[in-house]
């Protein structure tokens, strides 16, 4: 059974660092993204998402719209994620104009639904006869999942049922196809599984639970399914290898999986649903599989920034310890999915391993996925960039040195928006008698067990976290694994505490003040020697933030810099940081080589002070070199 549940988004009102990000999403990101979805911006990649729904609605009315679809086969999913982000934002801060915009969008979506409940603009517009014939590539179930999530969030935010009822009808259609009529199959891109569990908890309809369970339980049982499916059709979307079961996470029944393989986002979305289902049904065998997969990812396949999926080939996991910096794929959505997975594991087992990884992924890769102005986005998050190579040559084309305004495949931008807007669901949890503080997020929190508190902190730049207790009880606060020392004060008096799997448990009463002070030192991180790409390199971090070195702060050349072993590192300020951030200065040397490609003459050594900035803000001051892992001398 679950040890705790994440709070509902409505229970958290953000302030401080998270509050500023939620304000940015509310005031800039959500309106900007709607303008993109509605094709209103001339200088960014066209989305056509809303027009696809309009054209599908016309097709439902009997009009000829075969040329009316534009974009990826899963383009509808952007609508679900954007509505979900808007819904969370409405919970955080009511906005009648935004609500009106969402309602109008929902009207268009509802008009695109067919009488039998089917809802997918690609097939409604292009070819109704081919629906449900290409689960591997066509992603009908994936797009349905994101629309379900959007509908659930909007219902919880507003109480309005229209979108929820549309998706309930759609799920009944899907249930009829896969359960009642017993058609074989499971999603090529997992997502609907986790969405069905959300819908089940809202509606109580056990058909949702049964359908989720069928998709998970049948996955990988018939390892020839995608091959057999391909043999029955004469068309393809991507030309995927239907026999690559490791890429599709269908190489074995899910309870037998040992290694995280294949497309990274698909994998962690699947594992999220598996972990959630294990908690919902007390399936310990399923949870044991999740634990094996978690260990494989975090102990062998995760970047220091909380990024996963190291290879561009298939946006996938590579082999163990293959974590290149300059060709890293490290998709933003994959780190978001890793946070989803961590949150569900944390519900089943309160362990700081999971919340530590949520924090690492969020404050580094997820935040790096969006420009500080909220209008440009990274799909790929390399740990080293060299202009003229990155984003240019064939081996590095994916690792762009600057964030684009949008993408033809725009899964990441609305994903970032919905995660930031729902941050409370990851920061805080609860059970009958305990309030859990998993991440340090300033603001007011109300728990369903009656506890109430206000968190005050400058985190991630300040390391004192104050909890002012309005309604008391038992409080569980995570002590991050990176904090080698910490101090706990209750009403200004030190409290002796024992860490239990990374958490301290303290009884607090109405009116109490609890202060947790964490380690604020700058730390040198050394990679395991089995990571071939990182031999002789180090990375710096402070708190949850990994630091990088950009050319703009270092005479436009970070490749020639080596950090001094044992060198002094200090907190510093630089005038042109694009946000309220803190830099670090560290003793280093610059190597200057003689002319020629190779030489018998060693480089000249100059003593310098190198400047590092938080990884999440890189690329906000123009195109220049960037490196996380630095040579050490």
Which residue stretches match the model-derived regions?
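Low-complexity, Ser/Thr/Pro/Gly-enriched N-terminal "stalk/linker" regions
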Residues: 1-78, 103-123, 161
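C-terminal beta-rich recognition modules with glycine/proline-rich loops and embedded aromatic residues
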Residues: 10, 212, 290, 356-364, ...
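Hydrophobic core segments within long, regular secondary-structure runs in both alpha-
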Residues: 15, 22, 26, 34, ...
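Well-ordered alpha-helical scaffold segments within catalytic/enzyme domains
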Residues: 18, 83-96, 145-160, 193-205, ...
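A conserved hydrophobic secondary-structure block that centers on an alpha-helix together
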Residues: 126-202
């Amino acid at each position: 059974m679950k040890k705790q549940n994440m709070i509902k988004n409505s229970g958290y009102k953000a302030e401080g660092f998270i509050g500023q990000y939620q304000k940015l999403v509310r005031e800039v990101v959500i309106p900007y993204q709607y303008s993109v979805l509605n094709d209103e911006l001339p200088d960014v990649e066209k989305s056509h998402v809303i027009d696809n729904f309009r054209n599908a609605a016309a097709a439902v009315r009997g009009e000829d719209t075969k040329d009316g679809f534009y974009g990826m086969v899963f383009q509808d999913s952007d609508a679900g994620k954007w509505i979900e982000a808007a819904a969370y934002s409405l919970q955080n801060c009511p906005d009648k104009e935004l609500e009106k915009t969402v309602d109008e969008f929902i009207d268009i979506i509802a008009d695109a639904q067919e009488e039998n409940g089917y809802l997918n603009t690609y097939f409604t517009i292009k070819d109704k006869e081919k629906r449900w014939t290409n689960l591997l590539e066509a992603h009908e179930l994936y797009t349905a999942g994101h629309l379900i999530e959007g509908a659930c969030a909007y219902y919880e935010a507003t109480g309005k049922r229209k979108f929820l009822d549309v998706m309930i009808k759609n799920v009944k259609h899907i249930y009829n196809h896969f359960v009642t009529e017993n058609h074989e199959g499971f999603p090529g891109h997992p997502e609907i599984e986790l969405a069905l569990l959300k819908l089940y908890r809202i509606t109580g309809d056990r058909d949702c639970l049964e359908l989720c369970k069928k998709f998970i339980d049948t996955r990988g049982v018939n390892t020839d399914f995608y091959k057999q499916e391909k043999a029955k059709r004469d068309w393809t979307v991507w030309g995927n290898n239907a026999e690559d079961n490791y890429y599709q996470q269908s190489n074995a029944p899910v309870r037998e999986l040992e290694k995280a393989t294949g497309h990274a986002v698909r994998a962690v979305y699947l594992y999220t649903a598996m972990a959630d289902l294990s908690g919902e049904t007390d399936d310990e065998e399923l949870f044991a599989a999740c634990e094996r997969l978690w260990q494989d990812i975090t102990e062998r396949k995760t970047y220091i920034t909380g990024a996963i999926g190291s290879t561009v080939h298939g946006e996938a996991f590579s082999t163990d310890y293959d974590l290149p910096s300059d060709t890293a794929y490290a998709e933003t959505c994959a780190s978001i999915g890793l946070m989803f997975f961590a949150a569900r594991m944390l519900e089943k087992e309160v362990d700081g391993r999971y919340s530590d990884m949520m924090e690492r992924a969020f404050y580094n890769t997820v935040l790096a996925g969006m420009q500080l102005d909220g209008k440009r986005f990274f799909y790929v998050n390399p740990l080293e960039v060299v202009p003229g190579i990155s984003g240019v040559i064939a081996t590095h084309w994916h690792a762009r040195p600057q964030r684009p305004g949008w993408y033809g495949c725009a899964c990441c931008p609305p994903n970032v928006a919905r995660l930031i807007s729902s941050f409370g669901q990851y920061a805080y949890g609860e059970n009958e008698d305990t309030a859990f503080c998993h991440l340090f997020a300033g603001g007011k929190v109300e728990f369903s067990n009656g506890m109430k508190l206000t968190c005050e902190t400058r985190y991630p730049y300040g390391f004192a976290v104050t909890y002012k207790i309005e309604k008391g009880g038992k409080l569980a606060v995570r002590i991050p694994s990176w904090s080698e020392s910490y101090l706990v004060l209750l009403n200004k008096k030190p409290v002796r505490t024992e860490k239990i799997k990374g958490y301290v448990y303290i009884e607090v009463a109405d009116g109490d003040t609890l202060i947790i002070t964490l380690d604020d030192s700058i730390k040198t991180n050394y990679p395991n020697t089995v990571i071939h790409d990182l031999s002789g390199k180090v990375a710096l971090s402070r708190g949850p933030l990994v630091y990088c070195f950009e050319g703009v702060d270092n005479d436009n050349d970070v490749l020639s810099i080596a950090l001094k072993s044992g060198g002094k590192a200090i907190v510093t300020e630089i005038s042109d940081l694009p946000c309220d951030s803190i830099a670090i200065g560290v003793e280093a040397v610059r190597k200057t080589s003689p002319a020629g490609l190779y030489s018998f003459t060693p480089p000249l050594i100059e003593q310098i002070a190198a400047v590092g900035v938080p990884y999440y803000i890189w690329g906000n001051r123009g195109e220049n070199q960037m490196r996380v892992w630095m040579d050490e001398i």
